[in-house]
Amino acid sequence: MVTTAPHRDDREVMRDEAVMRPRILAALAEGPRTVPEIAAAIGAPAHETVFWVMAMRRYGWLAEIKGSETDGFFQYQTTGRTV
């Protein structure tokens, strides 16, 4: 179960990435979103969501939309990668 404690260890947050990936992909199925928008959609804190989004970006699950900044945040979209 994912907790929302403000001071979870970074390693603990990263272990949740595999669990959160389907929820993030489902949130982005509706269209591109920023990290705060993704966090709100999945019910997780933004400071943890940024870890998961960056990991998913690194491994080809997500891509930022170049030149589209909303309130200083890039929007992210799915890449269509499948397992």
Question: What is each residue range found by the language model?
Answer:
Residues 14, 25, 50-51:
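Metal-centered catalytic cores of metalloenzymes
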Residues 44-55:
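Short amphipathic alpha-helical interaction segments
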Residues 21-28:
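Hydrophobic residues on short alpha-helical segments
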Residues 29-34:
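Short capping segments at the starts of secondary-structure elements
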Residues 5-20, 64-83:
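Short, cationic-aromatic polyanion-contact patches
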Residues 60:
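Glycine-centered, phosphate/nucleic-acid-interacting loop/turn motifs that mediate DNA/RNA or nucleotide
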Residues 37-42:
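A short acidic, leucine-rich amphipathic alpha-helix
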